[in-house]
Amino acid sequence: MTKQVEIFTDGSCLGNPGPGGYGAILRYKQHEKTFSAGYYLTTNNRMELMAAIVALEALTSPCEVTLSTDSQYVRQGITQWIHNWKKRGWKTADRKPVRNVDLWQRLDLAIQSHTIQWEWVKGHAGHPENERCDELARQGANSPTLDDTGYNPD
């Protein structure tokens, strides 16, 4: 039987661009694991993507995943926009390079072996897991230790 996993994610950025962090919670039955990191210079969207990527990459076998995010950018990007981006060679409808393509490609790879239900939750609205992820993300942003090597301030 396929494992049923819940993932909750959030990203934060102080300045946008600026110091940023992500937080994620991975829950399987009664087990829970949290993920968090901070970057010296990044964007909010990159941190939202990283939260989902890191949690999904932690899964070691195919799972049925419910992934909750407060980022419409992540949810719409992975459920709607990515298909055409890939058809166009990672270009937008107006033929410009997709922003954050390094992370979109990594997320695309991370989802391949899983069945994922992408759920949007309103941020800062009292959703307990989203609030915890927000706290983890802000902690990361407030004490960065990593360079976001893929960040391109074009």
Swiss-Prot record:
Query: What reaction does this enzyme carry out catalytically?
Result: Endonucleolytic cleavage to 5'-phosphomonoester
Keywords, in A-Z order = Cytoplasm, Endonuclease, Hydrolase, Magnesium, Metal-binding, Nuclease
Q: Which cysteines are joined by disulfide bonds?
A: none
GO CC, one annotated term:
cytoplasm
Q: Single GO molecular-function term? A: magnesium ion binding
An example GO BP is: DNA replication, removal of RNA primer
Protein's cellular compartments: Cytoplasm
Any idea where the RNase H type-1 domain is? 1-142
Q: Where does Mg(2+) 1 bind?
A: D10, E48, D70
Q: Which Pfam families match?
A: RNase_H
Q: What is its main location?
A: cytoplasm
Cofactor names from the entry are: Mg(2+)
This entry's comment on the bound cofactor is:
Binds 1 Mg(2+) ion per subunit. May bind a second metal ion at a regulatory site, or after substrate binding.
Q: Which residues bind Mg(2+) 2?
A: D10, D134
Q: Which PROSITE patterns match?
A: RNASE_H_1
* Endoplasmic reticulum among keywords: no
Cite the EC number: 3.1.26.4
The family note in this entry says: Belongs to the RNase H family.
- Outline what the protein does: Endonuclease that specifically degrades the RNA of RNA-DNA hybrids.
Q: How does it assemble?
A: Monomer.
**Name by which UniProt lists this protein:** Ribonuclease HI
> What organism does the UniProt record list as the source?
Yersinia pestis
